[in-house]
């Protein structure tokens, strides 16, 4: 798929963990102007819900590097940890050598640093309440939970839209 083929207009991410730590999964989707969607998911055998939230966001940003997207595109997430980390905490962590206000090393530093990579697109995050009936959030949650539990789930791609 080239940048010229489709215009991305919406995105959503979620992470889930069975036990915390425990087996985890993440889900993500991108919706295009023509109504088509692509969905993604992944898992980790031993992780936390926060790591899965960050992994989902990192994956979708990596995908959006190579896709044309509308300037109004936001990434919907139910993770205040992700939003606060990206929008409030990260500048101070960087100033303090990736330490928290209390001087402790930032948790999940590898993923935060990857999310801060200058080649990733800067896209606004939009908070949505989890399990509230918001269609995209419910879908990426279902993907994340399925991957965390090792269940099969049909993901949409351009062939089955």
Swiss-Prot record:
Coiled coil: none annotated. Its EC number is 3.1.26.4. It is found in: Cytoplasm. It is an enzyme of class 3 (hydrolase). It holds the Pfam family RNase_H. One of its GO terms (molecular function) is magnesium ion binding. Its cofactor is Mg(2+). One of its GO terms (biological process) is DNA replication, removal of RNA primer. InterPro entries: RNase_H (IPR050092), RNaseH-like_sf (IPR012337), RNaseH_domain (IPR002156), RNaseH_sf (IPR036397), RNaseHI (IPR022892). Monomer. Belongs to the RNase H family. Endonuclease that specifically degrades the RNA of RNA-DNA hybrids. This is Ribonuclease H.
